[in-house]
Amino acid sequence: MKNKRNMRLRIFFNLLIFIILLFIGGHANAQKGLHINEVFSRYGNSKGCTMVEMNDIDIRGHRINVFKTLTYKRYAEEIAGIVEADRKQAKKIREVIHDGKVQSGCLMMPPTRKGHNRFVVFTNPINGTGAVIYIEGKVTVDDIMKICYKRNCKKRQIT
């Protein structure tokens, strides 16, 4: 009787560990196949950088599976090189150019096996601070532009 109980407990715990590893593994490999993964792994814990990761969230009415962001004050050249490597694989590219230089952009990367769209959004350093965002979910380029670039501007009347 004790052996049966121990066997059931062992099977239960093994199954539980397997399920947990499946869930964690899906988010841990979110950027699999993208160069941007290197930015988060290399600079995520560096001095002058702030990294935030959120999973399965709603942002402005859009369901996001993975939202990962890194702001940095250093490493601009290194990070720009890594973003450029992903730019070459991008399916769609939207950029904001000012005075002939790319200020920010949104790269639509190839989707995941589950059909989730993947995006790399970036801003090049202005006053020394830049940002890189990885977004994964059933959202479109237009949704990402609304999420990341929506400005809270009030109309002013000029008299």
Segments (PLM) and residue ranges:
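Bacterial Sec-dependent N-terminal signal peptides
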Residues: 1-36
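N-terminal secretory signal peptides
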Residues: 30-90
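Terminal interaction module
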Residues: 36-43, 72-73, 110, 149-159
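Low-complexity, flexible helical/coil segments
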Residues: 56, 101-107, 145-146, 155-159
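Short, surface-exposed beta-edge/turn micro-motifs
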Residues: 61-67, 102-104, 116-119, 128-130
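Mid-chain, structured segments of secreted extracytoplasmic proteins
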Residues: 72-117
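A short, solvent-exposed beta-edge/loop patch
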Residues: 108-141
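C-terminal partner/receptor-binding element of secreted or periplasmic proteins
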Residues: 129-159
